[in-house]
Swiss-Prot record:
Designated gene of the protein: arcD1
Cellular component, GO annotation: plasma membrane
Protein name per Swiss-Prot or TrEMBL: Arginine/ornithine antiporter ArcD1
Reaction equations catalysed: L-ornithine(in) + L-arginine(out) = L-ornithine(out) + L-arginine(in)
NAD recorded as keyword: no
Length: 526
């Protein structure tokens, strides 16, 4: 029987929470990102494919929340299913993904401000200016200090952010419907295209041809990371089981919320194809919706969207500042990281995790000055790494299905995992390889945790750590030598990577000795 929690949240409210929580900054740049990769027909097919894959993930998460209530979070599923090392890889990846997403927010926020002061905050190649780096650094440290004071969950802030987010999007949908031209939308609907660009990367023209199956596959492949990025955080949809009035409501809300998000995203990504040509959309610049609404209704529309986006991003950035440290705190509680990471201040905030994360964020905020198209670089990094976490969720359900001999769980878990793995293979493996540099840092801390808790790494863990660390080192050389086209795929060169790696090594050594000292104070010897 489905017991009722009288103080719980009803179905409609659950759906609203899921939708408002999932819509972040990525949706504001969705239209032009997709236009650079796909024609309208390709976008439609891509949404069908991605929607089905995300549905399988949500169903997997929802089943685990209801049937494994003793487990908490994505990394805990990986640990329960495949051991401590895999649980650590998932949790550390979640940490990495969350702060990479924050950097993407920072870049997008400054491109919004650049709408009012063209050329001041963003360079033509998509990198941030020195002034922008200074501004986002101040904002980032300010948000970290706010979270350390325990204000990340203020209801008033969330309400303001929700209004600032939804009003411009509603205006955009209305304007998109009013200005929609069927002839513009249907032109080249099912055709393949080749973009002819100048030295600055601006599309001068598109050359059209009849689309083949391979062409359509290429368009879907090119849209994968952009579309999955706007669903990053969807795991929160399945974590509502203990807050729902009925447990069955959590499952229904997950499905209804996903459908609502798909409708919103499809409208926002397809309506512009009925107002501008694909070439014009691809060249609108960042953030896409700001420039498109400006073209639709005039300057007031662009200003409304830009202001709404800045407020929305600040709110999302504030919430996401806590996400990475929640991951490291949980790893500490599970004894997969040293207890140093779980230490709380008098406000209940994990101060050490916050400061370490902010130091690493600061390093990569500086990198945004050197990286062309910085927004997409960090979007891809964030999305690629979290897809590993999502794949492990599906694999855990698949494993449970085999153990319980439940066919539905076997099928759902397999599809959820296969979708994430295939999407990574076709679109993001280069970023996973690059992320191994940061995993190498994590493995050092994982070993320290083992020391603190009086255990040793197993032979399998030592071998896995060695292999993954070597691959991380090879990634550095791979970028320098442009192995397998890494520089083109990642959008960074060797010198830019050096800007990040050198201070990262310094921070790693500092943290290592601080944590080691903390462990030794407890009387734990080698």
């Amino acid at each position: 029987m489905d017991a009722e929690n009288k103080k719980g949240i009803g179905l409609a409210a659950l759906v609203a929470i899921i939708v408002s929580g999932a819509i972040g900054g990525g949706v504001f740049n969705l239209s032009n990102d997709l236009a650079t990769n796909a024609s309208p027909g390709g976008v439609v097919i891509s949404w069908i494919v991605i929607g089905f894959g995300i549905l399988m993930l949500v169903l997997s998460l929802n089943h685990l929340v209801v049937n494994k209530p003793e487990l908490s979070g994505v990394s805990d599923y990986a640990r329960a299913g495949f051991g401590n090392m895999v649980g650590f890889i998932s949790g550390w990846g979640y940490w990495l993904s969350a702060w990479a997403g924050n950097i993407a927010f920072a870049v997008l926020m400054m491109t919004s401000v650049d709408y009012f002061f063209p050329g001041v905050f963003q360079a033509k190649n998509g990198s941030l200016t020195i002034l922008s780096v200074i501004v986002v650094s101040i904002v980032s440290w300010g948000l970290t200090l706010l979270v350390m004071r325990g204000v990340e969950g203020a209801a008033a802030i969330n309400a303001i952010v929700l209004v600032a987010k939804l009003i411009p999007l509603f205006v955009f949908v209305i304007a998109g419907i009013v200005t929609f031209k069927a002839g513009v939308f249907s032109a080249h609907f099912w055709q393949n295209f080749v973009a002819n660009t100048n030295a600055d990367g601006v599309i001068k023209s598109l050359t059209w041809s009849n689309m083949t199956g391979g062409d359509l596959f290429s368009q879907v492949k090119g849209s994968l990371m952009v579309m999955i990025w706007v669903f990053v955080g969807i795991e929160g949809a399945a974590m509502m089981g203990d807050r729902a009035k009925r447990k069955s409501d959590a499952g229904k809300a997950s499905i209804f919320g996903l459908i609502a998000l798909l409708v919103i995203y499809i409208l926002l990504s397809l309506l512009p194809f009925g107002f501008m040509s694909q070439q014009e959309l691809a060249n609108t610049g960042q953030p896409g919706l700001v420039h498109i609404l400006n073209a639709m209704v005039g300057g007031w529309g662009g200003s409304l969207m830009a202001i709404g986006l800045v407020i929305s991003l600040l709110g999302a950035w504030l919430s996401w500042t806590m996400l990475p440290v929640e991951a490291t705190q949980q790893l500490s509680e599970q004894k997969l990281l040293p207890s140093w990471f779980g230490k709380l201040n008098d406000k209940g905030a994990p101060k050490n995790s916050l400061l370490l994360t902010q130091l690493i964020v600061q390093i990569f905020l500086i990198v945004t000055y050197f990286v062309a198209d910085a927004y997409n670089v960090f979007v891809y990094l964030c999305t690629a790494v979290i897809m590993i976490c999502y794949a492990l969720v599906g694999l855990y359900l698949f494993k449970l299905g085999i153990q319980e001999k439940k066919t539905s769980n076997i099928i759902i878990g397999f599809i959820a995992a296969a979708f994430q793995i295939l999407a990574l293979y076709y679109s993001g493996w280069q970023f996973v390889w690059l992320s191994l540099i940061l995993y190498a840092v994590g493995f050092i801390l994982y070993a320290l945790g083992k020391k603190e808790y009086g255990t040793k790494m197993s032979t399998t863990e030592v071998i896995a750590t060695f292999i993954l660390t070597v691959l991380g080192i090879l990634a550095v050389f791979g970028v320098y030598g442009n192995w397998l086209g890494l520089q083109d795929a990642l959008g960074i060169d060797g010198n830019t990577l050096l800007v990040a790696v050198v201070p990262l090594i310094v921070v790693t050594f500092i943290v290592y000795f601080v944590v080691r000292s903390d462990i030794n104070k407890k009387g734990i010897k080698n």
